[in-house]
């Protein structure tokens, strides 16, 4: 009887061992893939500004010849509507600075009367972006007609176009480029940067970058960069004389570049037309106590050193 029970135990034990041996072993690769998948799930998704520029739908009179006016306005269409809205308004502001049109009267301009039927398809469209741009296009065409009436052979042109410059990170940037020639001695150009926080969905201004009570320190650093620029560009024998005509001022038009904070200036802001669109660069190593930590470049992690084999002894 005891022998029979012992035999039964041995049989059951042998069966359990056999079944365990038949189970498939876990593939190490599968385990590694699961670990990678877990890490990827835990890593936060970085927000990215994606978009394209699309031309504004304006109507211009038919024109043939080499002196036809060129009017091009493009707008940003992105995955962040709050940015599109801000850029749209800045485009309209830029057009107003270039053309400086007044509010249209009841009759409208000559060009407006010619294209009214095809450009505006009802009163409900008057406040749309394209309808507002059309007003500036009408003023632009009227200017062209006036110049041609004076027997001018000038070909006037106007371009306003945004571009995504920095799509990821703490600060994303859209640049708005504009250029125009309206029949004067020379053309004009401008470059404005608009910076945004995608997480908070807000525009970032220069003062947002600064630590408390550090604006004066930034102005001092920018003024030193200005002095260096004046002398390096050979604009004057000394900075004091130069500032009699072109005094320094701090620009609010900025870009966080790879090497430092870039302050962008427009034509005639800190120099004559010949200097174009000057910019001052303040290196990040000078801004450690001026900019908030989140706006400074993060130090790159040092690669792990390779193990060194030692001989036994």
Language model features with spans:
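Compositionally biased intrinsically disordered regions enriched in Thr/Gly
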Residues: 23-313
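C-terminal motif of bacterial Sec signal peptides marking the signal peptidase cleavage site
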Residues: 18-21
């Amino acid at each position: 009887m005891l022998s029979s029970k012992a035999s039964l135990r041995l049989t059951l034990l042998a069966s359990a061992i056999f079944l365990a041996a038949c189970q498939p072993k876990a593939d190490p690769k599968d385990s590694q893939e699961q670990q990678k998948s877990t890490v990827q799930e835990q890593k936060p998704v970085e927000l990215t500004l994606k978009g394209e520029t699309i031309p504004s739908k304006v109507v211009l009179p038919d024109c043939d010849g080499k002196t036809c006016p060129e009017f091009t306005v493009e707008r940003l269409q992105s995955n962040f509507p709050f940015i599109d809205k801000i850029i749209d308004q800045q485009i309209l502001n830029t057009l107003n600075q270039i053309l400086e049109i007044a509010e249209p009267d009841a009759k409208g301009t000559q060009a407006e009367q010619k294209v009214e039927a095809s450009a505006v398809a009802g009163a409900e469209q008057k406040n749309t972006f394209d309808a507002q741009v059309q007003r500036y296009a009408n003023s632009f065409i009227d200017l062209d007609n006036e110049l041609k009436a004076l027997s001018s052979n000038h070909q006037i042109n106007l371009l306003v176009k945004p571009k995504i410059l920095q799509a990821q990170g703490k600060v994303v940037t859209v640049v708005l480029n504009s250029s125009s020639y309206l029949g004067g001695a020379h053309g004009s150009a401008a470059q404005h940067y608009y910076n945004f926080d995608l997480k908070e969905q807000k525009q970032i201004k220069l003062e947002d970058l600064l630590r408390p009570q550090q604006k004066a320190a930034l102005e001092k650093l920018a003024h030193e960069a200005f002095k260096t620029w004046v002398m390096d560009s050979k604009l004057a024998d000394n900075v004091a004389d130069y500032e009699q005509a072109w005094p320094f001022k701090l620009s609010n038009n900025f870009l966080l570049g790879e090497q430092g904070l870039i302050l962008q200036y427009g034509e005639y802001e800190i120099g004559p037309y010949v200097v174009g669109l000057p910019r001052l660069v303040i290196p990040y190593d000078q801004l450690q106590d001026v900019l908030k930590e989140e706006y400074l470049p993060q130090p790159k992690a040092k690669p792990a050193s390779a193990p060194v084999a030692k001989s036994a002894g």
